[in-house]
């Protein structure tokens, strides 16, 4: 874990000599420097899907999902379709009143509607807010997504509201939150585990790789040849601190995949 990550992510902290000179120690020191320089709280969990080892900073602290919950929502669609619980090719419609900001796909498809599968892809790749709300409407609401997390062993993550209210997450809020430790393992289960069949996992993984916003976050610091994918989230809710989220996977050469 530590060797693969430390060799692949440049943190620019050569002026500090951490007391722990192991790769894990150096990486953790670099993360703390980033946190201090940003004058913010940095929550990180890097999970090695091979060794099951992890390295984290504030990994058990709760942070808001912002749009990152849409990864799990898309996974829920694919999983329940594979299990015969829903038909992901069922077409649904929505009204103009249901459209909101950051809804490029649903705005374009207002007249004709879309399948649940198309909405899942749109909410993962383009963070389409209206697509997420329509899916939540069709699949049982925020509580149903929380139930999906519980069904795969995630006892931490929760969704309580829909867009845009779920982005209002003050520091003391527990609604609509997860922890880096919980989400890194949830990503591992959904992308590399046996929650869904291979074809569905391949679809989800490709959607993550095709998500353009990730190119400006964690993936921007990775070697270009390393396969990777993610889901970002951002909140600039008035009266709350800004929040930036990125969850995903990376496949370093000669190392098991890592999730974060």
What are these regions (language model features)?
Residues 71-72, 174-209, 242-260:
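Active-site-proximal alpha-helical segments within enzyme catalytic domains
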Residues 49, 88-105, 139-140, 166, ...:
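Acidic helix-start/capping segments at beta-turn-to-alpha-helix junctions
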Residues 216-258:
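Short, Gly/Ser/Thr-enriched beta-strand-loop segments that form substrate-interacting elements
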Residues 17-62:
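Beta-lactamase-like hydrolase cores
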Residues 136-195:
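Mid-domain, small-residue-enriched loop/turn segments at the edges of structured enzyme/sensor domains
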């Amino acid at each position: 874990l530590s060797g693969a990550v430390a060799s692949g992510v440049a943190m620019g902290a050569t002026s500090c000599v951490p007391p722990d000179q192991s790769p894990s120690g150096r990486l953790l020191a670099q993360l703390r420097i980033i946190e201090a320089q940003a004058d913010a709280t940095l929550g990180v969990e890097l999970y090695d899907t091979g060794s099951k080892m992890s390295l984290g900073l504030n990994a058990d602290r709760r942070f808001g999902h912002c749009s990152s919950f849409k990864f799990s929502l898309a996974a829920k669609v694919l999983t329940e379709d594979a299990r015969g619980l829903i038909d992901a090719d069922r077409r649904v419609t929505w009204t103009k009143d249901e459209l909101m900001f950051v809804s490029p796909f649903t705005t374009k498809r207002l007249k004709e509607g879309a399948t649940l599968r198309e909405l899942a892809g749109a909410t993962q790749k383009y963070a389409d807010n209206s697509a997420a709300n329509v899916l939540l409407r069709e699949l049982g609401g925020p509580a149903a997504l929380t139930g999906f997390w519980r069904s795969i062993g995630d006892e931490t993550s929760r969704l309580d509201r829909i867009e845009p209210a779920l982005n209002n997450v003050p520091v003391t809020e527990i609604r609509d939150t997860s922890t880096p430790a919980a989400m890194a393992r949830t990503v591992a289960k959904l992308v590399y585990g046996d929650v869904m069949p291979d074809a569905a996992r391949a679809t989800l993984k490709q959607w993550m790789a095709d998500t353009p916003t990730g190119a400006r976050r964690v993936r921007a610091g990775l070697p270009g040849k390393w396969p990777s994918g993610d889901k970002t989230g951002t909140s600039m809710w008035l009266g709350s601190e800004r929040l930036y989220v990125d969850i995903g996977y990376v496949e370093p050469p000669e190392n098991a995949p890592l999730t974060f």
